[in-house]
Amino acid sequence: MASADAENFRLAVLNPGGRDQEQYFGENRSATANGHAPVNFHAYAACTHGAVFRETKRAIATEWPVLLLLRGDFRASERALAELKKSKRKTVVALKETGAHQIAHQLSDPARFARFLKIVREANGGIATTPEAADFFRLFRDNGIEFAPTPYPVEDENWNWAMENRSGIFVGTREFAVPSRNHLAALVAVKRLSDVTKEPVTVFNFGRRREAKLISEMGFRKIRVHEKRMNYRAYLGEVARHKIIFQLDRSRVPGQVAGDALLARSVCVGGDGAIERIAFPETCGEKRSDAELVEIAQRLLTNESERRAIAERATNIAKEKLSFRAGRETLAHFFAAL
């Protein structure tokens, strides 16, 4: 597809009955304080100057092609697809939660699995935010499936959170209860790194008092624990203060931890998400042991020139493969071919 055609492509992202409010991402539309950040599935709308909807009729009224999100028991998505087909809207579907453990949990229910199968086969196609989810979709249909990593506005200086005089280690995960997140192991590893390098640690913990006590019992020399949520821009500012973002996640997720690191112009160490594997091939968890990742992290904490070089290479990769321009071209080409 010609770049001019990609520039004119608009996408309606539909999350039927979802919690997020209707939101437009026009070229000249500035972000609002209470609007959703242009990340995750909102990024598909943002990179095409499209919009996010929760009401099917509103998405249909745009006359744009639709990306229909599958969530919950898929009943609302099934009804929405029927309306979209009746209105002859070109519609592709995507699982809203695409970590390996999340897909397995969602589709373990027989009725939900049957509904998923029907939706995937009746839609014009499917988009996956991870290569593994794309392969899973292809088990149910032979064509019309695309791996489209979630784009990030790395080319937009309004989202450039580069910062001088960084210090410390930011722990990218926060879920103790999900085994594949390896959050406990990450904290233990970071405790060791902090002891050796004298770098402070920051972690978010929205769990119960028991989890806060567990962190306290680890005996960090200097740790900052955030127990309250903050808006995305404030969160990025917090991430950007640190030398590295560290995680041991093995969930095959889309990779927002690495995406946050890209906007912070920092380095993500560990994790096997899609963005981690694309943007941080030198430091991601793919085919690396936890011990190797700890070694990499320790080296980067004490070698500023290497850390800056890896961050710069990640930014260059992202501008080529993960930017809003790249995302818009991928989506426009995919929908045109359906």
What label would you give each PLM region?
Residues 1-82, 87, 286, 329:
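N-terminal pre-catalytic "stem/leader" segment of glycosyltransferase-like enzymes
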Residues 99, 132, 147-159:
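Short beta-strand->alpha-helix junction loop in the catalytic core
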Residues 301-336:
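A charged, aromatic-enriched C-terminal amphipathic alpha-helix characteristic of glycosyltransferases
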Residues 181, 246-258, 271-280:
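Nucleotide-sugar-dependent
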Residues 110-144, 209-213:
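A short, active-site helix/loop in glycosyltransferases that binds the activated sugar's phosphate group
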Residues 237-253, 266:
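Acidic donor-binding loop of glycosyltransferase active sites
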Residues 25-30, 155-157, 161-218, 224-232:
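Conserved catalytic-core segment of nucleotide-activated headgroup transferases in glycan assembly
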